[in-house]
Regions:
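A short, structure-level motif marking secondary-structure boundaries and short turns
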Residues: 34-36, 68-69, 89-90
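Amphipathic, non-transmembrane alpha-helical secondary structure
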Residues: 8-11, 47-51, 55, 80, ...
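Short, conserved glycine- and acidic-residue-centered signature motifs
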Residues: 43, 76-79
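Catalytic beta/alpha-barrel core
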Residues: 1-53, 62-64, 96
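Glycine-rich phosphate-binding active-site loops on the catalytic face of alpha/beta enzymes
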Residues: 7, 21-31, 60-74, 99-123
Length: 123
C-alpha cells in the first residue's frame, strides 16, 4: 500500500509513500526518519523526474501518463515507446500509470514492473 503525498497518513497505516515529481523535501525526511526502509515511489513525467528518482533513491517510479487519461485531461500521453525509453533509463522498477484500463493494458511495454490506475478496477 502506498499513500499519495501524506507522510503522516503513511506512518499511521504502516504504508509506503508516493510523492509527486516535485516532492516536498521535508516530507521525505519525515518518512525516512520515522520509518526507515519504507517503500518510496515517485511520479515521473519526463527526464527531470528520472534525475529526481535517482537523487531520492526511490524504490520505484510511476511513469505517466502512458495513455490519455481522464484524471489529467490536458496531459500529453507518452505512448508505449516514450514510456519505455523513460523506464529503460530509470534505474529502478517502473510502473505504468495513466489511461491504463482493460482495453489498453495489453499495450503496456513488457518491461513494466506493474500498472497502477486511478479509476480502473478491472472493468
Amino acid at each position: 500500500l502506498l499513500v499519495a503525498g501524506d507522510g503522516r497518513a503513511a506512518l499511521r497505516l504502516g504504508a509506503g509513500l508516493h510523492l509527486p515529481e516535485r516532492p516536498t523535501p521535508g516530507l521525505l525526511a519525515f518518512l525516512r526518519a520515522r520509518r526507515p526502509g519504507a517503500l518510496l515511489s515517485l511520479a515521473v513525467h519526463g527526464r527531470r523526474g528520472l534525475f529526481r528518482g535517482r537523487a531520492l533513491r526511490a524504490d520505484a517510479v510511476l511513469i505517466s501518463p502512458i495513455f490519455a487519461t481522464q484524471s489529467h485531461p490536458g496531459a500529453r500521453p507518452l505512448g508505449p515507446h516514450g514510456w519505455a525509453w523513460l523506464a529503460r533509463n530509470a534505474g529502478r522498477p517502473a510502473v505504468a500509470l495513466g489511461g491504463v484500463d482493460g482495453r489498453s493494458q495489453g499495450r503496456v511495454p513488457a518491461q513494466a514492473a506493474g500498472v497502477a490506475a486511478v479509476g480502473w478496477l478491472g472493468g
